[in-house]
Amino acid sequence: DGLRVDAVASMLYLDYGKNDGQWVPNKFGGNKNLEAVEFFKHINTLILGRNHGTVMIAEESTAWPKVTGKVEEDGLNFSYKWNMGWMNDFLDYMKLDPYFRRDNHHKMTFAMSYNESEKYILVLSHDEVVHLKCSMLNKMPGLEGDKFKNLMAGYAFMMGHCGKKLLFMGQEFAQKQEWSEERELDWYLLENPEHKKIQNWVKELLHLYRRNRCLYELDSMQTMQTEASSALSERARMARIICSLSSISHR
């Protein structure tokens, strides 16, 4: 199906994680790893050219330009770029008690300021549910019932945001424990109505996404309003969808 290439920045920069005297500049005197650049261009062109539907995803944490740009435009030709900025802002926001979110809506809208720079994929990955970072469910604030509701709201926002979507296994039914390669997922949780509800919610969101082409065709959206107490966004495509993140009912 494809590859997610980890730590791309460490390959693109000769001085990545190194001090002065620990690296040698390229032939132009710069810090770009020219061989790595050509390797990515070649391998992405080769794989994407041979296999229709295959994706190549770059986990790249810097502002390197045209990660998903075409080779003819001096891009690296990846299918998508891992949107780490969105992920960090999203998780920081969702961890907050709803009372304090009104002053932090910028965390949910900032990704739109750079959305057009690359083809992004929104990811809640294995990296975020290991090493005492807690499962997605246990990142949510409040009592257990509140955690489920917050997680449902977060997934809905993610599905309506620009960019392709990717959940790590177990997140679709609110796995409680952190992920470990030494054990399987806690499938027995699906016998619990709340966990089954989350699974059905994710299924309905995916069906909604696939039924509405305006949610995925152009991946373009504009923020209409970012007041402290609300956040409204509009996806400007073949259809108009307005998302209101507020406790006030709108008609």
Question: Where do the PLM segments sit?
Answer:
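Short acidic/histidine-rich active-site segments
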Residues: 2-14, 168-173
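Catalytic cores of secreted or luminal carbohydrate-active enzymes
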Residues: 193-219
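Conserved alpha/beta catalytic core and glycan-binding cleft of carbohydrate-active enzymes
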Residues: 19-181, 189, 210-216, 220, ...
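Active-site beta-strand/loop architecture of penicillin-binding DD-peptidases
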Residues: 185
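Alpha-helical packing segments of well-folded alpha/beta enzyme cores
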Residues: 1, 39, 43, 154, ...
